[in-house]
Amino acid sequence: MNYLEFHRQWRPLGCFNVQQIYSWCPDFNRHNLRVWEQKGYITKLRKEYYAFSECKTIPDFNRYIANRIYRPSYISLHTALSYYGMIPEAVVQITSVTSLKTSSFKNDFGEYSYNSVKPGLMFGYEPKTMTDGRAILFATPEKALLDLLYLNPFYKTENDMADLRLDEDFMCEDFNGEIFKEYGERTGSKALNSRIKTLLTAYGL
């Protein structure tokens, strides 16, 4: 198999793994991947996962990869909060939530961290459409903030919540406090729900 044939097959997907390749072509010569990587045609994302190097120029493709290389997962926490304009900081690392074990990866597309939660907490996310039509799973604003509190129990007092520096205009105009509380109730955690109330009080909601 030559590279042009391979490219024609997998370019619409953008990134792919070795298992997918063998499902398509059982006699595929895996050595080709090493050769194409050395030539700069493809980039290794993590063990057995690759993307076409040309995809680096596609807006938001680095976020799309986050959903693909560690599944199930969705983008949440600081990356999602920054995406919605809820926090002032620019976020370099792409942060996600997963029901798998906590993990992280670094490749030419970026740095990726995955924080583990219970399978029952894998809710509150929705697809966001990229410029080229691909979908990226993002936590809703309310779930991104809930995930942050769940994974960082040291946020306890009103002062702690104020230290998050959440955008007050967003919190007053766009953040849905009722959904936030409903999400909290779904966790079944009294301690977390208490901290949710503290955060809402801190931001006058």
Give the predicted meaning of each segment.
Residues 20, 53-205:
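Nucleic-acid-binding surface
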Residues 1-72, 108:
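Short beta-edge/loop segments at beta->alpha junctions of small alpha/beta modules
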